[in-house]
Amino acid sequence: MITHRKRQHPIRVHLLTVLIGSLWLAGCASSNTASSQANPAAADAYTQLGAAYLERNNLPRALNALDRALDIAPRHAEALQALALVYQRQGENALANDYFQQAVDAEPDFTRARNNYAAFLYGQGQFDPACEQLETASQDAQYANRSQLFTNLGQCYLALEEFDDARARLQRAQSIDPRNARGYLMLAELEYSQGNYAQAWAPLQSYLQLAEPGQAALEMAVDIAHARGDYSVAADYQRQLGTN
């Protein structure tokens, strides 16, 4: 008889790394913060200039441009969160936290800022406040990356080992975007880590159909297939592991 031993796989992915491609730099839409009345066009222009420098990792010039924007409009939410990102890259975590907080205070509906603030908090190991920011952000039904946001929220609850909340948020991510590969993988890993092999199989199969599988996903597939008694399927995944 083949005995099956559950293998634990890490279910955390560095949230900051995942989010880096979705930072506010993409698009760089100007903010509608009400207090940007002194010269909003100039504040927006300096903010976009700062964004361009930040994208090229020219942090001193980004800092200078964003300071100019905030001289004109001290509560310009885009400039505040951009400055937070600059300080985050420089390792000035206290300043980054302060400017992220100012950004979401200035514009409470600024979902991208909350998402980026949550990434920062998660990277600092502050999982509870990160989840709080993501919960607030998740209420924005018009947010373009809402499925990713719910996936991030599920991951945040995983870090807190609040598995029911994590499962609910990951399932919500899939209902919003059925092609969210990362969400399927995280849901499969959650169920697998809890020994729920039957529940892990379907999301794992969805992930394998949508993405190029890595070693951890294939090993999980081998284990679950063995647990299901699907030895030929397990052997197929084992062969893929050998060529991966």
Question: Model regions: which residues?
Answer:
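Bacterial Sec signal peptide processing site at the extreme N-terminus
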Residues: S22-A45
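Residue-level recognition of tetratricopeptide repeat
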Residues: A42, H76, F110, A144-R146, ...
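Structural marker of alpha-solenoid helical repeat scaffolds
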Residues: A38, I72, D105-E107, D140-Q142, ...
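Post-signal-peptide N-terminal segment of Sec-exported extracytoplasmic proteins
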Residues: Q37-D98, E132
